[in-house]
C-alpha cells in the first residue's frame, strides 16, 4: 500500500474528528494517472504490520464464535455439586427406565399366567389318556389366539406411529394483502479489499468465510474509519457486529502500543451477546496483538477486575457490571476512551438500562467517537442519540420494521376452545415437519419454557432451554450444544431474540406471539440471516389478529396459514396426558433442590462472615441503584411493555423521578402550564375571569381609581358572576326550546329513558345549586 508521509505517523486516536492531516488515521492511497502499484519486498512487511502476524492456509472456514473455552473456565470456578442433586436429563432418563421396567414386568406377568394355565390343563389331562389329542388341539388354538393378539397390538402401535408421522393431512393456504410491494433495486457492493482494510484483517475475514461485505458494512466502515459519529439502523442478520468491529480493529493496528489504555468500549444488552461479540472479535484480531476483555455478570468479579487493571484495548461489557467496576474498583476509569459503541440500543433501553447508559456516557470524554447501532429507531433511541452523538451521519439499510426477503412465514391459527392443545400442536409439527434440527422455539414465560423442555425430553426429542432462571454456565452450555448440533431444538425466552448469530438455524417457532412488531422481527431474525433461506411458524390466537394483519401487509413474500390435522393433535394430547405425573414429580424434585441450594448459599455467607470477622473491615460496596429502585424500574418497564396491567396494585410505589432526583414530569408541566389539571370548562371559566378582571382594571386606570380598593374588587367579581349567569340562562333557554320542539315534532309523550335523563339533569342542577350556596356562605364568612 502506498501511504502518505503525513498519515503514516502514529498519534493518539482522540483527535480523529479533526480535519488536520496529522491526526487523521485513514490510510490514503495516491493513485496517479498512469502509475501502477509495486509489490513490496518481504523485508518491508515488518514496517507495515505488527509483530506476531502469521498466516496459515486453511480450507475450512472458521466459525465466528465459540463458547467452549469460557464454559471450561466457569466450570473450574464453580463449586462441586452437592449430594442428592441430579441434572434434568438424569431425571428424565430415570422416568424412562422406570417405564421400560414396568412394561417388561407386565409382559413377564402375562407370560407366567399363560404358562400356569397351560400347566394346570396339562396336569388335569394326564389322568385321561384318551383326551390327549383334544388337549393338543386346544393348546394349538390358544397359541394361535396369542399370536393374533400380539399381531393386533403391533398393528395398533404402527397405526399410532403412522398417525403421528402423517405429513399430507396438513392444509396450507396463502394469505394475501392488498398492498403492492415495491421493486427492490440491488446495488453493487465493494469488496473488503476496496474498503482499505489491512492485510491481517483481510486474512482473518477470509478465514472466517466472509466473501463480500453486507450493505451495512459497506456503508458504515468508511464512515467509521473517518472518525465520524454514526447512527445506523438495519434489519437483524445484516452483519452489524462486523460493521463496527472491523473499523475499530483497523484503527487500533496503528495505535501507540507502548501506552496502555482502554481505548474502545462496546456496550451490549445481554451476556450472550457480549460473549458472542468478544468471540467474533478474537477471531478477527487473531493475526494482531490487540487485547480485549469481557465484563458481564455471572462471572468472577475479581478476575474481571484483574483484567481491567491490565488496560486492554477493547472492553466488551453489559451496563450493570461495568458500572459496578467503575464505582468500586480503584484506579479503573474511562478517561482515555476514544471510541464508544452502543450495539442493540433499542434493546438496551427496553431492558431498563437508560440511567446506566447516561451515567456511562457522562463518564466518557467528550472528544470521543460514538457509534450507535439498532434494528429499530423509536423515540427513545433518537433521544439517546441526541445525548451521546455529535453531528451523526445516519446510515439506514432496508426498510424499518420489515423482515428479510428470504424468509418464508407460516401461521397456525388456534381457536379459543383449543388453546390447551398448543403443546400437542407443537409436538406434532416438530416430529413431522420441523424434524431436521436447527429449530428455535420462543415462549413468553420461563415456566412454559421449562415445562416444554421436560415434555420434549420425555418424548425422546433432543432439546435445550435458555432463559433467565438458568445459571450463566447453563445458558452458555445450551447455546454451545445447539451450535454444535448436539441438540435439535432450543426452547428460549426473549433472551435469545436479539443479536445471536447461530449458524444453521432453519426455522423459528413462536409458541407465544410477542407484544409488538419489533419483537416479532427480532425473533424471526434468528433465521434467514446474511442472505440464507429460513422459515418461521407462529401460533396465532384471537388476541393476535391485529399483529397478524401488520405482518401480512409488510411481508415481502406471501405468507401462508397451516391447519394441523386433528388426528395428530389427538395423538399427542393423549401422550402428554400420560406424562403429567412424571412432569409434576420432576418439578417437585427441582423445587426441593432449589431450596437446598438456597440453604447452602446462606451457610456459605455465614461462614465467610465468621471467618472474616477478625480481619480488617473492608470498605462498603457502592451500588448505583438500591434493590427498591431496581424493583421500581422493573415494574415501570413491565408496564411500558404491557406485561403488567397499570391498574394492578404494585408492591412498591413507583417513583418516576429516577435515581438522580430529577423533577417529575407532572411538576415540570405544572410550572409551565398554569391551567394544568383543570378540565376544559374550568380552564375557560378561569380565562374569562382573568380577561374580565384585566378589562376592569384598565377602566379603573382610565377613570383614575385606586387599584387596591377592596370594594371595587368585590364589584368586579359580582359583575363577572352576573355575566356568566346571563350566558348560562340564555344557553338553558335555547336548550329548553329545542327540547320542546323535538317533543312536539315526535308527537307523543316522553319515553322512560328520556324521563330518566331529564330527572338526572334536574338532580344534578339541584346539587350544584346547593354546593354553590355553601361556597358563597363560606366566602362571605371569611371576608
Swiss-Prot record:
Keywords: ATP-binding, Chromosome, Coiled coil, Helicase, Hydrolase, Nucleotide-binding, Nucleus, Ribosome biogenesis, RNA-binding, rRNA processing. Its EC number is 3.6.4.13. Residues 1-20, 56-173, 665-783 are annotated as: Disordered. It catalyses: ATP + H2O = ADP + phosphate + H(+). Residues 72-180 form a coiled coil. PANTHER family: ATP-DEPENDENT RNA HELICASE DBPA, ATP-DEPENDENT RNA HELICASE RHLE-RELATED. One of its GO terms (cellular component) is nucleolus. A motif (Q motif) lies at residues 190-218. ATP binds at residues 234-241. One of its GO terms (biological process) is rRNA processing. Residues 762-783 have a biased composition (Basic residues). Residues 221-395 form the Helicase ATP-binding domain. It holds the Pfam family Helicase_C. Residues 126-149 have a biased composition (Acidic residues). Residues 110-125, 156-167 have a biased composition (Low complexity). This is Probable ATP-dependent RNA helicase ddx27. Belongs to the DEAD box helicase family. DDX27/DRS1 subfamily. It comes from Dictyostelium discoideum. The Q motif is unique to and characteristic of the DEAD box family of RNA helicases and controls ATP binding and hydrolysis. Its main location: nucleus. Residues 72-93, 688-706, 715-741, 752-761 have a biased composition (Basic and acidic residues). Residues 406-570 form the Helicase C-terminal domain.
Amino acid at each position: 500500500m502506498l501511504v502518505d508521509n503525513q498519515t503514516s505517523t502514529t498519534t493518539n486516536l482522540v483527535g480523529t474528528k479533526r480535519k488536520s492531516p496529522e491526526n487523521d488515521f485513514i490510510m490514503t492511497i495516491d493513485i496517479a494517472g498512469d502509475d501502477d502499484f509495486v509489490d513490496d519486498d518481504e523485508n518491508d512487511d515488518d514496517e507495515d504490520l505488527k509483530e506476531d502476524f502469521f498466516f496459515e492456509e486453511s480450507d475450512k472456514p472458521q466459525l465466528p464464535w465459540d463458547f467452549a473455552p469460557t464454559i471450561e473456565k466457569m466450570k473450574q470456578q464453580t463449586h462441586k455439586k452437592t449430594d442428592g442433586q441430579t441434572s434434568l436429563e438424569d431425571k428424565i432418563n430415570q422416568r424412562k427406565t422406570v417405564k421400560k421396567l414396568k412394561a417388561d414386568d407386565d409382559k413377564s406377568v402375562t407370560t407366567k399366567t399363560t404358562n400356569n394355565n397351560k400347566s394346570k390343563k396339562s396336569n388335569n389331562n394326564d389322568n385321561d389318556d384318551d383326551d390327549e389329542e383334544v388337549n393338543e388341539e386346544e393348546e394349538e388354538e390358544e397359541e394361535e389366539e396369542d399370536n393374533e393378539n400380539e399381531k393386533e397390538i403391533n398393528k395398533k402401535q404402527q397405526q399410532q406411529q403412522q398417525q403421528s408421522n402423517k405429513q399430507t393431512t396438513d392444509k396450507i393456504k396463502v394469505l394475501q394483502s392488498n398492498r403492492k410491494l415495491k421493486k427492490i433495486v440491488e446495488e453493487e457492493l465493494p469488496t473488503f479489499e476496496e474498503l482499505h482494510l489491512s492485510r491481517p484483517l483481510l486474512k482473518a475475514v477470509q478465514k472466517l468465510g466472509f466473501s463480500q461485505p453486507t450493505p451495512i458494512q459497506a456503508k458504515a466502515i468508511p464512515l467509521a474509519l473517518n472518525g465520524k459519529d454514526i447512527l445506523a439502523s438495519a434489519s437483524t442478520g445484516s452483519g452489524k457486529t462486523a460493521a463496527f468491529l472491523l473499523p475499530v480493529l483497523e484503527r487500533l493496528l496503528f495505535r501507540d502500543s507502548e501506552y496502555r489504555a482502554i481505548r474502545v468500549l462496546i456496550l451490549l444488552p445481554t451476556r450472550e451477546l457480549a460473549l458472542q461479540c468478544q468471540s467474533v472479535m478474537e477471531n478477527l484480531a487473531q493475526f494482531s496483538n490487540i487485547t480485549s476483555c469481557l465484563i458481564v455478570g455471572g462471572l468472577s468479579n475479581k478476575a474481571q477486575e484483574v483484567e481491567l487493571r491490565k488496560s486492554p484495548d477493547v472492553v466488551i461489557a453489559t451496563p450493570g457490571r461495568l458500572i459496578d467496576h467503575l464505582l468500586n474498583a480503584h484506579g479503573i476509569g474511562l478517561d482515555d476512551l476514544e471510541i464508544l459503541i452502543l450495539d442493540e440500543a433499542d434493546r438496551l433501553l427496553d431492558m431498563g438500562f437508560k440511567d446506566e447508559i447516561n451515567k456511562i456516557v457522562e463518564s466518557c470524554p467528550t472528544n470521543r467517537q460514538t457509534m450507535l447501532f439498532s434494528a429499530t429507531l423509536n423515540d427513545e433511541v433518537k433521544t439517546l442519540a441526541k445525548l451521546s452523538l455529535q453531528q451523526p451521519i445516519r446510515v439506514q439499510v432496508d426498510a424499518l420494521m420489515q423482515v428479510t426477503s428470504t424468509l418464508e412465514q407460516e401461521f397456525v391459527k388456534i381457536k379459543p376452545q383449543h388453546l390447551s392443545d398448543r403443546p400437542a400442536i407443537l409436538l406434532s409439527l416438530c416430529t413431522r415437519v420441523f424434524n431436521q434440527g436447527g429449530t428455535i422455539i420462543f415462549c413468553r414465560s420461563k415456566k412454559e419454557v421449562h415445562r416444554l423442555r421436560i415434555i420434549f425430553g420425555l418424548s425422546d426429542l433432543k432439546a435445550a432451554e435458555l432463559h433467565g432462571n438458568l445459571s450463566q454456565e447453563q445458558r452458555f452450555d445450551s447455546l454451545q450444544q445447539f451450535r454444535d448440533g448436539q441438540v435439535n431444538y432450543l426452547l428460549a425466552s426473549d433472551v435469545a431474540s436479539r443479536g445471536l448469530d447461530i449458524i444453521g438455524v432453519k426455522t423459528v417457532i413462536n409458541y407465544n406471539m410477542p407484544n409488538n412488531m419489533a419483537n416479532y422481527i427480532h425473533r424471526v431474525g434468528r433465521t434467514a440471516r446474511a442472505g440464507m433461506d429460513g422459515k418461521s411458524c407462529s401460533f396465532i390466537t384471537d388476541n393476535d389478529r391485529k399483529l397478524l394483519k401488520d405482518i401480512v401487509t409488510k411481508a415481502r413474500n406471501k405468507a401462508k396459514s397451516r391447519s394441523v390435522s386433528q388426528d395428530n393433535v389427538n395423538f399427542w394430547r393423549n401422550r402428554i396426558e400420560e406424562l403429567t405425573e412424571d412432569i409434576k414429580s420432576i418439578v417437585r424434585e427441582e423445587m426441593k433442590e432449589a431450596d437446598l441450594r438456597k440453604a447452602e448459599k446462606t451457610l456459605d455467607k455465614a461462614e465467610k462472615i465468621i471467618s472474616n470477622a477478625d480481619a480488617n473491615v473492608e470498605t462498603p460496596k457502592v451500588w448505583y441503584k438500591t434493590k427498591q429502585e431496581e424493583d421500581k424500574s422493573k415494574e415501570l418497564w413491565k408496564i411500558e411493555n404491557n406485561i403488567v396491567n397499570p391498574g394492578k396494585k404494585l408492591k412498591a410505589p413507583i417513583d418516576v423521578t429516577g435515581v438522580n432526583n430529577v423533577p417529575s414530569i407532572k411538576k415540570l408541566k405544572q410550572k409551565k402550564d398554569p391551567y394544568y389539571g383543570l378540565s376544559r370548562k374550568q380552564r375557560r371559566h378561569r380565562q374569562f375571569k382573568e380577561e374580565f378582571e384585566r378589562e376592569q382594571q384598565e377602566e379603573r386606570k382610565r377613570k383614575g381609581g385606586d387599584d387596591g380598593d377592596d370594594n371595587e374588587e368585590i364589584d368586579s367579581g359580582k359583575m363577572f358572576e352576573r355575566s356568566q349567569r346571563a350566558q348560562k340562562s340564555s344557553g338553558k333557554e335555547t336548550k329548553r326550546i329545542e327540547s320542546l320542539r323535538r317533543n312536539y315534532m315526535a308527537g307523543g309523550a316522553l319515553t322512560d329513558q328520556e324521563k330518566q335523563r331529564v330527572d338526572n339533569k334536574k338532580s344534578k342542577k339541584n346539587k350544584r345549586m346547593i354546593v354553590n350556596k355553601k361556597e358563597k356562605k363560606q366566602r362571605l364568612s371569611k371576608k
